[in-house]
Amino acid sequence: MAVTMRQMLEAGVHFGHQTRFWNPKMAPFIFGHRNKIHIINLEKTLPMYNDALKYARQLAANRGTILFVGTKRQSRDTIAEEAQRAGMPYVNARWLGGMLTNFKTLKVSIKRLKDMEAALEAGETERMSKKEALLFEREMAKLQKSIGGVKDMGGIPDAIFVVDVGYHKIAVTEANKLGIPVIAVVDTNHSPEGIDYVIPGNDDASKAVALYTAGVADAIVEGRANAVNEVVQAARGGDGDEFVEVNAEA
């Protein structure tokens, strides 16, 4: 379902940061200011948001992977819930330096986490001493918190979706270094440089964050569904006509 400008207004997407903290590179997306707060031009935001969703939809239709990134308190739960709904990996605790640029090291940690989960499932912790079991549980909980959202990623993602580019500048820098497209919410206090699909908007309000994230997840789900429908149509011959058995005696 398409998001309207009214929904963006109700979610507070148009509220930027204090004027004294602005980044001049966001000037093209600013409508004006009120009470020393910059007001973002939603007539610019809405089509750019839709462009970002179109890209996410196409990427998902081609079986691409989009990594969701949002580690701020007000976005953690939303990022995890929507990424899981879309069947995509996510980072909602802390971005570990090298998650993209040093993926080999991350794979070692992922293997460790999976081995520990398998050991727990097999009941191996029951044979440990209380102290060993406690240390095991602590290590596994720590790994689940930091990399649990990416344990099934399998490799470098095809794109990343970021809420707040300033807070996650290391993630953006790593993606830029590897040529991974970046979809991101950019507020008035940050630069849109290095972002392939800019969504000018409030990156702090929970309702705004929920709106962007749900939209990206919806686009992914829709893209995958469209891809499945195309495969089904192709299997049927492409024209959707029903197969009619011809009686040889007719």
Swiss-Prot record:
Q: Its Gene Ontology molecular function terms?
A: structural constituent of ribosome
Q: Which GO terms describe its cellular component?
A: cytosolic small ribosomal subunit
Which portions of this protein are annotated as coiled-coil regions? none
Q: Which InterPro entries would you find in this protein's record?
A: Ribosomal_uS2, Ribosomal_uS2_bac/mit/plastid, Ribosomal_uS2_CS, Ribosomal_uS2_flav_dom_sf
User: Which GO BP terms, alphabetically?
Assistant: translation
Keyword 4Fe-4S applies: no
Instruction: Name any one Pfam family assigned in the record.
Output: Ribosomal_S2
Query: Which UniProt key words apply to this protein?
Result: Ribonucleoprotein, Ribosomal protein
Membership in a protein family: Belongs to the universal ribosomal protein uS2 family.
Q: What is this protein called?
A: Small ribosomal subunit protein uS2
According to its UniProt entry, this protein's organism is Paraburkholderia xenovorans (strain LB400)
Q: Taxonomic lineage per UniProt? A: Bacteria, Pseudomonadati, Pseudomonadota, Betaproteobacteria, Burkholderiales
Q: Which gene encodes it?
A: rpsB
